[in-house]
């Protein structure tokens, strides 16, 4: 190696089963090169709600083309804690990191509404409408395209898988979405 082993590599959940995502190629390259690596395959970060979707949530809505599909959100703080443990122990392999439950976006909006000082409504825009709206907001078509891919996996029922990997590494349950929302209500 290059004297920088082992490496902890942040990937995406399903990279081992989805060759189209760039993470799959990077994971394969590291394995084929014989490089000691811990792969952290994270589900959808809870932090996306308090960053990427912050303004629309403040406006009382969350518009994503996820249909009634569920997502097993993960707190980036849990992912970071698993990364630290992997570095401390020198463990290698792969961890699929999710939260404790899979929720649809109606349920997400219900949780947001229960904590915030206003109601948040879920709307399920068409993909063209979502792309246009995100482009107007961010001026970044590539980002909007990635978001469509992410929400399409939820729509198709491919984002609802949960694992015990956070619990097994940290000896405590992963953060649930309600706790995350309470911790970040001022965001």
What are these regions (language model features)?
Residues 127-187:
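A hydrophobic C-terminal alpha-helical subdomain
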Residues 2-6, 12-121, 125, 132-137, ...:
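Oxidoreductase cofactor-interface core, primarily capturing Rossmann-like NAD(P)-dependent enzymes
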């Amino acid at each position: 190696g290059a004297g920088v082993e082992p490496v902890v590599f942040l990937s995406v959940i399903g990279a081992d089963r989805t060759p189209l995502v760039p993470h799959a190629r990077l994971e394969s390259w590291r394995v084929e090169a014989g490089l000691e690596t811990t792969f952290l395959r994270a589900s959808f970060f809870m932090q996306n709600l308090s960053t990427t979707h912050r303004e629309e949530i403040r406006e009382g809505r969350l518009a994503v083309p996820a249909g009634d599909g569920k997502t097993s959100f993960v707190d980036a703080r849990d992912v970071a804690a698993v990364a630290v443990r992997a570095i401390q122990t020198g463990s290698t392999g792969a961890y699929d990191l999710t939260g404790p439950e899979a929720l649809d976006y109606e349920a997400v909006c219900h949780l947001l509404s229960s904590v915030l000082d206003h109601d948040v409504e879920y709307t399920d825009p068409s993909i063209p409408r979502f792309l246009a709206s995100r482009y107007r907001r961010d001026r970044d078509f590539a980002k909007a395209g990635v978001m469509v891919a992410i929400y399409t996996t939820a729509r198709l029922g491919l984002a609802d898988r949960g694992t015990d990997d956070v619990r097994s590494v940290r000896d405590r349950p992963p953060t649930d979405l309600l706790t995350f929302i309470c911790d970040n209500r001022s965001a």
